[in-house]
Amino acid sequence: MDVPIDFVIRSASAIDPDTLRTYAERRLAFALRRFESRARRVVVRLGDTNGPRRGIDSRCSITLQLRNGRHIDVEAVTAWPFASITLAAKRLNEALRRELEKDQHSVRRRRRTSFDALVEA
């Protein structure tokens, strides 16, 4: 994937940050493969919300900056950092797909109104 990815990892877990980084890169490459031309930059933040305590404490937030200047932010909180990355990447894919569908719908609407104006003239 040619899109630059910035990582901010704040974790008290025993998992190696490089392992998390590699996993996140792979998941994001999969989630963004169809939309890579529209992405400018990705920022991934991983952290433990509870510190060393147990419970749901692994948070992954992903910010995607699009080439048109818009930003898409998603977040996932689970008990396991790999699951947080996977869920956040899935949510990013869904949010990006919805964003692009909105753009396509508005372009179709503009074309239709332009065509209607020509027909009425």
What positions do the PLM features span?
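N-terminal, polar/charged subdomain of small-to-medium soluble alpha/beta proteins
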Residues: 1-121
